[in-house]
Amino acid sequence: MTMINPLSYPVPSQYSYTYNNNNNNSNNSSNNNSNNNSNNNNNNNNNCGVPNVSYGSNLNQQSMAQDLRVPEQYSISSPSPKKRPFNSTMTTSPPTPTLLSNSPYIHGSHIVPQYSPQLQNVYNTPHQSSHSIHQPPQQTPNIFNNNNNNNNNNEKSNNQNFGNTLFNSITNNSSNSSNSLIQQNNLTNNGSSSSSSSSSSTNFNQNNNFINSSNDSIYNSNICSFYGNTSSSSSSSLNGIESPPSVELMDDDIEDQLREYISPVIWGMMDNYAREQFYNAIVEFINEEISFRSLLLELRVIAVMDVNYKSIFQFLVDLFLSIEPNQKMVNYLRDNGVEENEFNIDLKSLELSSDNDSNQKKKRERIRKSVSRGLRNPPNKWAKEESQKLIQLVHEHGDKQWKKIAHQIGGGKTGAQCAQHWKRVLCPAIRKGSWDEDEESKLFNLVEKHGQSWKNVASEIRTRTDIQCRYQYFKSCMSREVQWSSREDEILQKKVSENNQQDGTININNTRDISWMDVSKAMARGRQTKIPRTALECKTRYFQLNFGGAPIQIVVPHNDDHLNNPHSPLNSLLQDQNCY
């Protein structure tokens, strides 16, 4: 490994022995200074970008001319680049899922293609455990630790929010299972571990220089930062390939299943350059530099080493549709630039299945609502036979035992509904139609007594329901807010004369025989006002025009307390000059 010239970059005296002492002394020094450098060692173990190697006598054989300065793009003082490379060596792919079992690349023994030198450099290198070098704790000045720590912290923060951010941007109203799908692109981003010392070799130290102009070695040494850091002290080999890294199981089984789908594509079907492209596209999308449509455009050009899946874009489209095969997902992908020929499913059959599913869902919803209505809130419509049976049962059991009556009627009717239907519709004491002047005057007196407690008002009126009382009261108040016109006065005088005419003469003294309800209906036919005049209003207006003076006081039998109160709501309503 190429080291930094201590003459060019001054090193404190307490660290200078690591450049001159041999391997045996380094072990003793590490034990003596373990307490002082514990925090530094923890940081070094978390940084998979800087390999921990021993600095023995083999480094002294290298001439000082070989110690070059740090390149400008990787200078110590320069900030970390925007698009950061990966931070660890690549590990092998996990077992192949069922979805990719037909792939010509995955099928068989996972042989690395010849045109992928990066993969062969890692995968096809024999496991040389006998030549491994003991690695003492890192005690040299952490020249690259600051930058690497910043990179790792940024990458961890991005990776932690990667799944939720990307999923919320991709499928706004999709199911929660799609969130697990996008999270698998991290491939255990939050897992933290250090590289194994037993699997390191001299060949690894020679071919993986951190300061190197070759981008391949940088990608090769920094891949762990995005795809997750893994560790395994003992790894078995299969056909010359190490076993897949140990992955911590998630709480949700769906996440484990989705990881099995995506892991073979990322690890076994993409080279380092494709992973770099994929990583940069994801970072730009998370930083809201590009839209989801632009992200799909960039994913189109990232090729994978499989003839079945030409790009990671096509793989993700197929995976989206396999996770959520419905028309809603198809429409969303179409809106973001996916063409018809890029769907590897039969859209017509999908539409038919979606229609069937929607119909079944609507049918289940109707059944659920009907059952709910039948048990708790059945429809208000009563059949003629049910109404007749209710009348018969009320005559037999009275108007108090509504639960017993409802049980005998059946059909999901409750006792409250039977009582309501009887009191509001079927009770012979309840009057229908217009209110006469006596009912209306009694209504205003009861409103003055009980306020707008319509149940109490209706219980004393006895001939009207609570709904009828409420409606009539507000209609009367609104009608009195409109002043009488001269045309209305003429029609009122004419209708009263026609109703009270006897033998061609008008009996002014016999106003009790006048049907003010008929007069009110005749006034309503003239359509002079939007709200028809009530019977009490017509009577009051007629006495004001013919007899003069203050409006007539309506006396309700057995309840004349309101006459003693000149400021009562009834008298104030009747005496309001704007009403006449």
From Swiss-Prot:
SMART domains membership: SANT (SM00717)
Return the annotated DNA-binding positions. 402-426, 454-478
Which GO BP terms sit in this record? culmination involved in sorocarp development; positive regulation of gene expression; regulation of DNA-templated transcription
According to its UniProt record, where is this protein located? Nucleus
Return the PANTHER family for the record.
Answer: SNRNA-ACTIVATING PROTEIN COMPLEX SUBUNIT 4
Q: Which SUPFAM superfamilies match?
A: Homeodomain-like (SSF46689)
Organism in which the protein naturally occurs:
Dictyostelium discoideum
Where do Low complexity bias regions lie? 20-47, 87-101, 126-203
- Name the UniProt record assigns to this protein: Myb-like protein C
Cellular component annotations (GO), alphabetically ordered: nucleus
Q: Which gene encodes it?
A: mybC
Keyword vocabulary terms for this entry: Activator, Developmental protein, DNA-binding, Nucleus, Repeat, Transcription, Transcription regulation
Explain the purpose of this protein: Transcription activator required for the culmination, at the time of the fruiting body formation. Regulates genes involved in the cell differentiation within the fruiting body.
Region: Disordered, residue numbers: 1-58, 73-101, 121-203, 354-380
